[in-house]
């Protein structure tokens, strides 16, 4: 249980709130499609391959500018708590804004849409896109579920989580 940079190695895996839900659903034999905006680079390509490996559909992923968002997890041990460092600035989803997703295409054949409180916490424009996604889903009579997934260290752009999540839950 080494602390950050006590080891010369970092282990890289793909994950994230909504992606983890999609993988879990696919593991239970349910159809799951992942909707997000990813950069056009080899790391994003590897992420897409990983989702496909677990049976998650990726045809609704939009490719855009920016980079992959990263978080670093330092596992805790005994009295030392776990620690997470988020590096989401300039990621594709942090740069995403309303209008970047074709909702007719994204929600075609969809009857359930799941979102977490992590995406709207990343940036103000990602928050606006998140609110747009929920409104567009409801407009199409798609069931919306939301895991608040509060991450204090992500809410840095001036809006409070309680304010935004209340709006998403309407």
Enumerate the language-model features and the residues they cover.
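Alpha-helix C-terminal capping segments
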Residues: 20-31
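Conserved beta-alpha-beta core of the PfkB/ribokinase-like small-molecule kinase fold
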Residues: 112, 118-170
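Glycine-centered short loops/turns at secondary-structure junctions
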Residues: 29, 55, 139-141
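Positively charged, low-complexity intrinsically disordered leader regions
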Residues: 1-3
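Short pre-catalytic strand/loop immediately N-terminal to key active-site residues, enriched for Gly-Thr
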Residues: 5-15
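Conserved N-terminal subdomain of the carbohydrate kinase-like
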Residues: 31-117
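Conserved donor sugar-nucleotide recognition element shared by glycan-biosynthetic enzymes
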Residues: 14-18, 43
